[in-house]
Amino acid sequence: IAGPKVLEHIVDTVLQFEGDQHYMYRILRSIKNRFGSTAELGIYEMRQDGLRQVSNPSELLLSQDHEGMSGIAIASAIEGIRPFLIETQALVSSAVYGNPQRSATGFDIRRMNMLLAVLEKRVGFKLAQKDVFLNIAGGLKVNDPAIDLAVISAILSSNMDTAIEPEICMAGEIGLSGEIRPVNRIEQRIGEAEKLGFKRFILPKYNLQGLNTSKLKIELIPVRKVEEAFRALFG
C-alpha cells in the first residue's frame, strides 16, 4: 500500500489529532506506539494564543447549572486511560413531519437505535413515534459503552419531562435483554465522580464484587436491569 501507510510502518509513533472547527476541544490519540501504550489520550483547548492542555476535562465538560432541566444525565467515561465525566443531553418530542427523526452527535447512531429498541421491547416505553435527538456536550466523540446507561436515562428524562437529580452520576453498558452489564475500571470512574462532589453513583451490580467501599463517601446504587435504574432515578 503506497502513500501515508508506508510512512506509518516506518515511524515509531503515530498520533491522531481529532477535533472540529466549531468546538474548542481537541483530542490527541496514540494510534501506534512501539515503545509504550496506545491507551493514552490528551485533551486540549483551543484558545486565542494556541492550544493549551486541559488538566481537568470533567469540570469543563459539565454544565455549571442544570438543576431542574430534563433530558440531562452525567456519565463517567474512560477515554484512553483517564476517566472523566461527560454530560449526555437528549431531547424527545412528538414527530410532526411523518417519519420520526433520529440524530446523535458524539455517539454512534446505530447504538442509540439499539438502545431505543431495548427501551421499547424490554421496558415498555413507546418511542416509535417520537423524534429523538442525542448530544454529547463539548463536541467529544465517545465510544465507551459504559455511557449507555446515561444515554437511556437522558432519553427517559426528556420523554417524561422529569429532571434527574444533579448529584447523580452513572456508568453501565446495556445489553439486548435490558440487563446492565459490568464495565471496566469502575474504581476510577467512581473516584472521578466523588472528586467532583457527586453524592450518588449508579453502577452494575456485578461491579460491586471485589470493590472496596470502606473509604468511599459516595453512595453506590447497584442495578441489574434497566427497570431498576428507572426506579432509582425516577421513583
Q: What are these regions, as identified by a protein language model?
A:
Residues 1-235:
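Peripheral, non-AAA+ core regions of ATP-driven protein-machinery
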